[in-house]
Amino acid sequence: MENKPSVLTERYEVGRLLGQGTFAKVYFGRSNHTNESVAIKMIDKDKVMRVGLSQQIKREISVMRIAKHPNVVELYEVMATKSRIYFVIEYCKGGELFNKVAKGKLKEDVAWKYFYQLISAVDFCHSRGVYHRDIKPENLLLDDNDNLKVSDFGLSALADCKRQDGLLHTTCGTPAYVAPEVINRKGYEGTKADIWSCGVVLFVLLAGYLPFHDTNLMEMYRKIGKADFKCPSWFAPEVKRLLCKMLDPNHETRITIAKIKESSWFRKGLHLKQKKMEKMEKQQVREATNPMEAGGSGQNENGENHEPPRLATLNAFDIIALSTGFGLAGLFGDVYDKRESRFASQKPASEIISKLVEVAKCLKLKIRKQGAGLFKLERVKEGKNGILTMDAEIFQVTPTFHLVEVKKCNGDTMEYQKLVEEDLRPALADIVWVWQGEKEKEEQLLQDEQGEQEPS
């Protein structure tokens, strides 16, 4: 393949080589518009055409566009020149799960987390008629938050690839992870073949080695055909039972994903995950509301009294600085940035803070206290232009009147506007007196404030 371009269509800077295969190389890239990190898969057209794999490339594109899930590597766009095809995909900073397993077996709770995310992704793909057919740790990537991402759909199949008997017939996958019915070159169900591979992955995560391994390939196939494997002594009984059902050589009696989710080991991990999330949410609430709740004094860990941080106040000059004139713009202005939203509230600061924490929890947003009256709100899932983050800051105009500004810090502006309009506005209705842009209420608000400020 010829030398890589340093810039791709003036949209992406192309950096270091991340990996390569027979027909493609993957490079680190960065968007010139958003500064977002991406991976750029460069495929040699001539090589692909020469061996008749053009349909496979088209299928991979179709599959990745269908399989949009938090635990599946996202395809951002596809471009082509005379000699190359470019996939711009999600960059997974953590690399392959294989590299982590190569260092030894994982702790059970860590293995459960990855297995849970793998099953979630595979179940979603199956619901969209997509079968991966090459599930292995080398094709499971980790993002910078240590979340698993299923990648490499080059050997995947769509439901319309089945023959009249309703089965798939192409032998695909890596030998050590392939189901017996695939090796036997008989028709097979894509769902059951993927479940077998997931079972092998689970074994590898917990054991640190393969369940079926032999220097002689035919002997390894024999072991796979008979499900001839032994679980190490440190495997929990619930794990052993689940693995025996996933690595059932009879695909007709092999466990389904629905039953995997009902298994005791899967549910036990889910229960622990729920408890951990609840603990984190409580911690977030404590961090967000303490010690700012009522504006009174609090105590530190030693029982000593201390003054809580105070909200930023707005004087007449601050209000004018926020404005485009001396009218109601003292609070909002007729022209405002699409990346900012403001509302006025007649509720005390403690009630506004409590409501922000409650709404963040309902909308599954992370919330962190940044300072006096300043909170960082963050979406868990990465959006089109990265993770959406916002600052919510409370300003005191008078003791009974506050201005709250919600400003986008990162992410997609359209996504921010949609969140504000469809989620935040309805959820915050109890504490809002007027939102920026609601003219009639703004005028009434201005009259009320002027009345309060007139000398007696």
From Swiss-Prot:
Cofactor(s) this protein requires: Mn(2+)
Binding site for ATP: L18, G19, Q20, G21, T22, F23, A24, K25, V26, K41
InterPro entries, per database record: Kinase-like_dom_sf, NAF/FISL_domain, NAF_dom, Prot_kinase_dom, Protein_kinase_ATP_BS, Ser/Thr_kinase_AS
Phosphothreonine: residues carrying this PTM: T170
Disordered: region residues: 280-309
Domain Protein kinase positions: 12-266
UniProt catalytic activity: L-seryl-[protein] + ATP = O-phospho-L-seryl-[protein] + ADP + H(+); L-threonyl-[protein] + ATP = O-phospho-L-threonyl-[protein] + ADP + H(+)
A single GO BP: signal transduction
Catalytic-site annotation from UniProt: D134 (proton acceptor)
Region (PPI): 338-367
EC class name: transferase
Coiled coil: none
Segments for region (Activation loop): 152-181
Phosphoserine modification, residue list: S156
Alphabetized PANTHER family for the sequence: CALCIUM/CALMODULIN-DEPENDENT PROTEIN KINASE KINASE-RELATED, CBL-INTERACTING SERINE_THREONINE-PROTEIN KINASE 2
Domain writeup: The activation loop within the kinase domain is the target of phosphorylation/activation by upstream protein kinases. The PPI motif mediates the interaction with the ABI (abscisic acid-insensitive) phosphatases.
Family: Belongs to the protein kinase superfamily. CAMK Ser/Thr protein kinase family. SNF1 subfamily.
Subunit structure: Interacts with CBL2, CBL3 and CBL5.
Protein name in the entry: CBL-interacting serine/threonine-protein kinase 2
